[in-house]
Structure formats: C-alpha cells, structure tokens
C-alpha cells in the first residue's frame, strides 16, 4: 500500500502530543485544527508521523547550525553528517527520511550506544583505554554503521516549506 507523502504534517513538539490519552486522536485533531486532510488509516498515520519527525529534525538541525555560526564567526563548514544512535538507528524509513529532509548523510548505529558507552567507561577505569578518542576509535572499528544519503531534494524542500507554514 502506498500512502501519499506529506499529505498531513504535524509539529511533533506541539504540547498536545506530550501525553494524550490517544495519540491517533491527537494527530487527527491537530490536522483538523490546521485544515489538513485527516489521516485515518494506520499507514496514513505512520506516514504523517515519519514525515513530520524528519521535517522537525531539519528545523532543529538548521537552528543548531545557525547557533554554531553565531557562536563562532570563523566557522565556515557546515555539518555534513548526522549520527543516529540507539534504538532509533534501526528505523530505516525514518533514517532515510531524515537524510532526505536535512540534506546530509545519516549514519545509523550503534543500536546499543548507552551500553557501549558504559563498557568504554569501565575500560577506562580499568586502565585499558586512555581517553575518549581511543574509545571512539574502538567503537568505530567494532560496529558497522548504515549510511543513508539524501534523495529527492526538491520534494523535501517543498515539504519543508509546507511544514513551516503549518507549524507557525
């Protein structure tokens, strides 16, 4: 089943999504309130959520880049890779949508970032590693990351403009 992309868009950080009794009903209410098509099927609801999360990631990503430039006027390079760790790194659709929306390469993994960090801290306490750079190198050499490259730039740029209008 194919579901239309960007048919319905929400701001995932809207307070109405903090702890609703029904997330589906909250999404539908938001779409009604913003005069959008109301997602009805599970596929439409999932697509709304994934599209909206990726577009929100782009917005926050742009804010962070702007903040970095404002703090360091000599900062000339843009962030060109976004790392997603933890359980979210397993969601291939959201990771691809995130790459598409942000326009940067997404590297997904490791899934168990917290556990690996804990292991590395224990290794440091035992004198087996000397610093964070060595820890990062060990993890990088031990874990296969999945790389997602941006696609469909024009489509996602248009969707982002729609997102900004809806979420103002």
List each model region and its residues:
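Active-site core segments that coordinate phosphate-bearing ligands/cofactors
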Residues: 1-69, 79-81, 90-114, 120-151, ...
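Intrinsic-disorder-associated, low-complexity terminal segments enriched in Asp/Asn/His/Tyr and depleted
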Residues: 72-74
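Glycine- and other small-residue-rich loops at beta-strand/loop junctions that grip anionic moieties
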Residues: 87
């Amino acid at each position: 089943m194919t579901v239309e992309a960007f048919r319905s868009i929400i701001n995932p950080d809207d307070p109405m999504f903090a702890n609703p009794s029904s997330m589906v009903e909250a999404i539908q209410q938001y779409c009604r309130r913003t005069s959008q098509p109301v997602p009805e099927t599970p596929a439409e609801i999932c697509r709304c959520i994934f599209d909206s999360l990726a577009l929100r990631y782009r917005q926050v990503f742009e804010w962070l880049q702007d903040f970095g430039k404002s703090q360091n006027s000599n900062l000339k390079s843009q962030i060109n890779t976004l790392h997603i760790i933890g359980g979210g790194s397993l969601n291939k659709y959201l990771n691809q949508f995130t790459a598409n929306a942000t326009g940067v390469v997404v590297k997904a993994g490791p899934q168990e970032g917290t556990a690996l960090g804990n292991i590395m801290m224990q290794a440091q306490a035992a004198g087996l590693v000397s610093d964070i750079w060595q820890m990062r190198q060990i993890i990088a050499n031990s874990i296969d990351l999945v790389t997602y490259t941006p696609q469909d730039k024009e489509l996602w740029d248009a969707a982002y403009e729609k997102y900004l209008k809806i979420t103002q």
